[in-house]
Amino acid sequence: MAVDATSAHTADAFPEESPLEGVALAHDYVTQRGGAERVALSMSRAFAGAPLYTTLYHPEGTFPEFADVDVRPMPINRWGVLRRNHRLALPFLANAVSAQHVEADVLLASSSGWAHGISTSGRKVVYCHAPARWLYQADRYAGTGAGSRGLRSRAVKVATDVFGPSLRVWDQKAAHTADRYLVNSTVIQRAVSQIYGIDAEVLPPPPAVLSSDGDVRSVDGVARPFVLCVARLLPYKNVDLVIEAVARIPDLDLVIVGDGPERRRLEALAHRVGSTTLAGRVTDEELRWLYANAVGLVAASYEDFGLSPLEAAAFGRPTAALRDGGYLDTVDPGRTGVFFDAPAVDDIACAVEELTRAEWRDDDIRAHADTFSEARFVARLRQIVEEELHHH
């Protein structure tokens, strides 16, 4: 995905629709800048004027576009320390959400674990980004595994250990108050089925794809031909494996966009194997140049929703991706990219070699990216809400 990029498709991307009366929105907490918050903004554009109920609202920590939304935080929002770090609020959020009742014909809840528990007088549609990670993937969510450090991680670990059993009961009950479940990917569809026993429709979110028609600025020191890897430098992103894999391929360089705690280790590895440039954080203009000039993208991490291949596809570039997770939804093998079966150096190298040898149709790849547009997301969302309004 774009690093430090805030560009996204906006309401200008689809025709203005007449407002639907009786619709309210909900989101877990409006305190950060993430994919779930982008979805909440898309929902707000789809249902202009609808109030957005949430546990916590921290304007300085989230997208500025929320200033134009009727955000209605709960009383727990009075505690500034919780607004600034919603994870510390974990022990208190179930009670806060349970106390909130929304008068609406349809409540559309954007949820990763809390908003689906808000009660309503009408129908409830839940858009699930993932079942509550702090309950079902606690180590990954908060870094609470062996060796984790820091007050926040320890606090969240204590909270999940102490409150986890009761929160799981609450979460299960909350999930089954929904009249309809939507999910962002087939991966989450399976998780919702396994955890809740609920059948959900897959409605991919509108990705914050970098516009391909903006300004461009070249990146110094980049040799061509090259493949691109766009990722936060974290262990589970498997960037080290990508470095070693591309280093095996003659006459091909690798450019890595992104930053993170693994940077120093990856710089040492890149220096040792050669043919690798760690570009760090780049501007939108530089990222456009990189996508436009790359042979393709390499994506080797497990993701619930595989965004970066769609960003590459907007520039007509194919992707070599791990055959797992969200990439199963966002890469069309043979048309927009190739898969490798395991995050292993040999597998990645073979896939990248296949990508460089194949002939790709730029127009087909771009057309694939267009199927994930905000216009399509909004149209289906409005159709679903209209159906639920008729049930009310």
PLM feature spans:
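Active-site donor-binding segments of glycosyltransferases and PAPS-dependent sulfotransferases
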Residues: 46-115
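Short hydrophobic beta-strand element within catalytic cores of glycosyltransferases
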Residues: 299, 318-322, 331
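Nucleotide-activated donor-binding/catalytic signature segment of Leloir-type glycosyltransferases, i.e.
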Residues: 264-285
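A charged, aromatic-enriched C-terminal amphipathic alpha-helix characteristic of glycosyltransferases
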Residues: 343, 356-386
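Acidic donor-binding loop of glycosyltransferase active sites
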Residues: 292-304, 317
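Membrane-proximal helix-turn-helix segments that form the acceptor-binding/catalytic region
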Residues: 143-181, 189
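Conserved acidic donor-binding segment of nucleotide-sugar-dependent glycosyltransferases
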Residues: 333-334, 338-345, 352-359
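Conserved donor-binding/catalytic core segment of Leloir-type glycosyltransferases
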Residues: 207, 213-237, 243-249, 255
